[in-house]
Amino acid sequence: FETLASYGEVQQEKVDDMREQNKSVHSQQKIALVVDSTCDLPVDILEKHHIHVVPVRLNFGKEQYIDRVTISNEEFYSKLANSAHHPQTSQPPPADFRRMYQFLSSHYESVISLHLPKVLSGTYQNASAALEKVTFKEHQVILDSLSVSAGTGVIALELAEAIDQNMSFAELTQLADETVEKTEIFI
């Protein structure tokens, strides 16, 4: 998008991960797990467990990026060290969540969507508003992680491993509640 911006003004950015979509089509899992990109898990773990990520927006002054899509972690830390602007984030728009849920609803029976605490960000609310407009065959739930970064990552990994073990949706939501309750992170 940076290259295109030099030729004019980018009005809107839309990015789809075709590799991830292909994996979803061929997945044997019945329950999808969705997180936002503040969930601090390495890409190899996200891919291994088919964890679907809706990216947050990052702003350095007037420059806007889509986390992990139009800016890598390395580029982010380089900008952090060299930019005169302190980065700011904004939650993914409801349309990003809706697009993700619509795609997943055609390949999975249920979805668990785990996000930043609703008291810290509008991410949870945007995910919830989007999910109200999409129907899965079985179940759908939005979970407040009550945590950030690595804390959300721990919860997501616990759920992903349980999904891999074919736990039922009811067992997964109970596990989520227990894991959220016992997960603490110090900043």
Regions found by a protein language model. Give the residues of each.
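N-terminal glycine-rich anion-binding loop in soluble enzyme alpha/beta folds
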Residues: A32-Q91, D96
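Short glycine-rich or small-residue beta-strand-to-loop segments that form or flank ligand, phosphate
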Residues: S110-P117, V141-D144, E158
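Internal, active-site/partner-interface "lid" segment
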Residues: E2-V25, E161-I187
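Short Gly/Thr/Asp-enriched flexible loops that form oxyanion-binding sites at enzyme active sites
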Residues: H115-T135, V154-L157
